[in-house]
């Protein structure tokens, strides 16, 4: 499955070892499915995606929740959205063998700023062209996908201050998942108030982090 290179930062939006595989492991299995297991019978889930990028996490979330009686409010932070040519080049719906998701996926990418778009009857997406540091919203989020570029590329996104800001946006028992398991990141999350779970990572990554607000 495709990934995209950000030439300015010399970093890819997803693992070069398979974008779909990585996102399913880190964000779906360790995040979304864990939240649903913890909150059986919940009717609504507010998700914050820090680093919308290619939109893959949103697409996989739509795929995973469509058959369930769960209303998703999906807030996507992306200060540098992809251009139309890059979006057209993404092959995720074909790779998933889900051509029926192609139109909803396109709706996600062309959503108006700060206005919900009904991707499906149970999935509303909100686009926020701001940085995580400047993002302001009520305390409603049960799940955070932290998919920013790595600390070596954007160290300013992996600080105690940023994680404390996210902590304050989340509900009790909320979950934050990220592919990064560096010691500095674990310590910053702990200092922000989270309980840390180190769990097996996707291919070519030994560990990842699931952080819980208790």
Predicted regions and their residues:
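Rossmann-like AdoMet
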Residues: 1-45, 62-96
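Conserved S-adenosyl-L-methionine
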Residues: 48-53, 78
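A short glycine-rich, Lys/Arg-flanked "PGG" loop and its adjoining helix->strand segment in the class I
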Residues: 156-173
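Conserved beta-strand signature within the Rossmann-like core of class I S-adenosyl-L-methionine
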Residues: 143-145, 172-180
């Amino acid at each position: 499955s495709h990934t995209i290179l950000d030439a300015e930062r010399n970093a890819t939006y997803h693992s070069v070892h398979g974008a779909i595989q990585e996102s399913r492991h880190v964000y779906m299995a360790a995040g979304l499915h864990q939240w649903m297991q913890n909150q059986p019978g919940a009717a609504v889930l507010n998700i914050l995606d820090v680093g919308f990028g290619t939109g893959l996490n949103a697409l996989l979330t739509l795929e995973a929740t469509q058959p369930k009686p769960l209303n998703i409010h999906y807030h996507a932070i992306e200060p540098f959205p992809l251009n139309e040519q890059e979006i057209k080049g993404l092959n995720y719906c074909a790779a998933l063998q889900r051509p029926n998701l192609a139109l909803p996926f396109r709706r996600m990418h062309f959503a108006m700023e700060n206005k919900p778009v009904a991707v499906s009857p149970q999935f509303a997406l909100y686009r926020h062209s701001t940085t995580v540091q400047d993002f302001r919203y009520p305390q409603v989020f049960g799940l955070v996908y932290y998919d920013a570029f790595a600390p070596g590329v954007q160290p300013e996104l992996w600080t105690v201050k940023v994680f404390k800001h996210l902590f304050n946006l989340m509900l009790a028992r909320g979950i934050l998942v990220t592919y990064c398991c560096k010691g500095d990141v674990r310590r910053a999350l702990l200092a922000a108030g989270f309980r840390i779970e180190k769990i097996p990572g996707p291919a070519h990554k030994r560990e990842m982090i699931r952080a819980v607000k208790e």
